Amino acid sequence: MAEVVKTSAIAPATTMSIPPIVVMAAKAGWRWQWQRLMGGLGPADAAGNYCRPKSDHLEAEVPNPLDLQSRQPDQRPHLIVGRSCPWAHRTWLVHQLRGLDQSLNLITAHADHKAGRWQLDPPWLGCSSLLALYQRCGAPPSHRATVPVLIDPSQPKILGNESAQLVEVLNRWPSHNDAPDLAPPDLQNSIHRWQELLQPNVNDGVYRCGFARNQAAYNRAVTALFAALDQVESSLKQSGPWLCGEQITLADVRLFPTLIRWEMVYAPLFGCSERPLWQFPKLWDWRRRLYGQPGVQTSCDAKAWRHDYFGALFPLNPGGIVPTGPDLTTRVASGISNE
């Protein structure tokens, strides 16, 4: 008769009639498969640290402002974003904060989990997928079709597909006279310093936590992540209300997509749960303040985030169950966490 294997103390009080050797073999097999599957999400170094793959980006361009002003609405450049992508969210935020809707059209691509690509519904320029659109624009066959991407439909041509460059381009994009400058010359050094801290430790840091291949790699990532958040909290306390002082800048734009997804995705799925955000009161107020800026709430879709992260990242959520979550606006506006 098979030996009865008792479940752990954290599971319901049940037993299962599975021989221990089968359980051990299943764990070993799953561990091996998990490592292979995680490799599909992103590479890791020999120590198990997640390393973001190099992007296939094209140098960004800004069309002639006079040319843009003379175009019909359907011939304006189009910014294509995905609701769940935090890198695309940066460009969307600049579009909203600077009121670029009169000179730049916005398209939202949808994640197709089965095909593993971005889909365009309805199709645009005769293309129903972002890959087909990249190919139509003459992108090298080896390039991944990623969001965000800025496309000029008159040729058609890709004007840029790297978020770090595109936020700079969109900050110089023709707009109405009172559109804010998110990177004024006197704050360039401060913006750059924040970028140097936040990109590896927070923006990539949450992925380094979630995609770590072992406990030591996770421990390193989560320590760096919360140390960086402590620095943000301290800076906001001393010289807020924004990261660079009295005005919102690209430094705020780059941080916001990560922190607005915190309770919905990164804490529960990526293990970024050492401390809840409400324990950073200045950072909590900062997030609430930015969320309340005109047009920002429109760019935030918690349901899409949960659906795409929990539904697509099979190695992190093999059951495929997409959890419900708190109302985003209620959570952001609250000073009390339910965690």
Question: For each predicted feature, which ranges?
Answer:
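C-terminal alpha-helical interaction module
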Residues: 1-339
